[in-house]
């Protein structure tokens, strides 16, 4: 993984999004609904649903909200959302990959286009930046929650089928093949680890530093994309901040 670390930036963005918690719950409800509708309402038999529920819990989403989304899918609701991706460049030439879940493609396309153009970015064609990212399973163990040292964690990760381990002062970050993600996650939980985060994500193969004079624009672009009700995830190839 060439030293790319996500955890510090993830924590920063989660803290910044506390004020937007209601919108986050709305987006998670949409994901839960679609996962339950396509794969069934039982998380034990639906790995995708289980993963989204875990994600919802890590964002402190109330249990009642989770149950309502599942019951809505069980009740035969006719709501349908399309999965769409958008690609482009942020100020400074930083690649951006956006995942959306929408019931109105025109509205979403307009929102994304405006976010890029108003904040110094440029929306690209399909495939323009996707090849710069790899789909990976991503798991985090907060070091304060385990007595295991790096050697022990590495051994357990390899035994579980993980691909890579990165260690920082705060966390163990584990990367997996997407197809092995659920098995690795379950094995680590069985080994007694408490997971701070576990999700499928997009990891840039290479990163680009954001120029100092473009940083504010870059942050505004990401915020504008995340503010869209239809945008589920925003991935960038920005270099990690020190």
Curated annotation (Swiss-Prot):
Q: What is its main location?
A: cytoplasm
Name of this protein: Probable transcriptional regulatory protein lhv_0777
- Identify a single GO molecular function assigned to this protein: DNA binding
Q: Subcellular location, in the record's words? A: Cytoplasm
- Coiled-coil annotation reads none
Q: What does the record give as the organism's lineage?
A: Bacteria, Bacillati, Bacillota, Bacilli, Lactobacillales
Q: Which UniProt keywords apply?
A: Cytoplasm, DNA-binding, Transcription, Transcription regulation
Where does the record place the region Disordered?
1-22
**By its UniProt entry, which InterPro entries does this protein fall under?**
Integrase-like_N, TACO1_YebC-like_2nd/3rd_dom, TACO1_YebC_N, Transcrip_reg_TACO1-like, Transcrip_reg_TACO1-like_dom3, YebC-like
**GO CC, alphabetical:** cytosol
């Amino acid at each position: 993984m060439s030293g790319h670390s996500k955890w510090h930036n993830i924590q920063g963005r989660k803290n910044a999004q506390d004020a937007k918690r209601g919108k986050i719950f709305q987006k998670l409800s949409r994901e839960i609904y679609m996962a339950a509708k396509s794969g069934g309402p039982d998380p034990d038999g639906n790995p995708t649903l289980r993963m989204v529920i875990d994600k919802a819990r890590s964002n402190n989403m109330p249990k009642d909200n989770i149950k309502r989304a599942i019951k809505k899918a069980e009740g035969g609701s006719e709501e349908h959302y399309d999965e769409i991706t958008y690609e482009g460049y942020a100020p400074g030439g930083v690649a951006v990959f956006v995942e959306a879940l929408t019931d109105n493609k025109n509205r979403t396309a307009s929102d994304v286009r405006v976010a890029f153009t108003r904040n110094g970015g440029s929306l690209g064609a399909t495939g323009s930046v996707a090849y710069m990212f790899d789909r990976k399973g991503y798991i985090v163990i907060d070091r304060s929650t385990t007595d295991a040292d790096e050697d022990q964690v590495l051994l357990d990760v390899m035994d579980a089928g993980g691909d890579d381990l990165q260690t920082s002062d705060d966390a163990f970050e584990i990367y997996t093949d997407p197809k092995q993600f659920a098995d690795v996650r379950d094995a680590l939980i069985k080994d007694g680890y408490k997971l701070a985060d576990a999700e499928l994500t997009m990891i840039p193969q290479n990163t680009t530093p954001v120029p100092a004079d473009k940083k504010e624009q870059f942050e505004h672009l990401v915020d504008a994309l995340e503010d869209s009700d239809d945008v589920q995830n925003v991935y960038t190839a920005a270099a990690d901040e020190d």
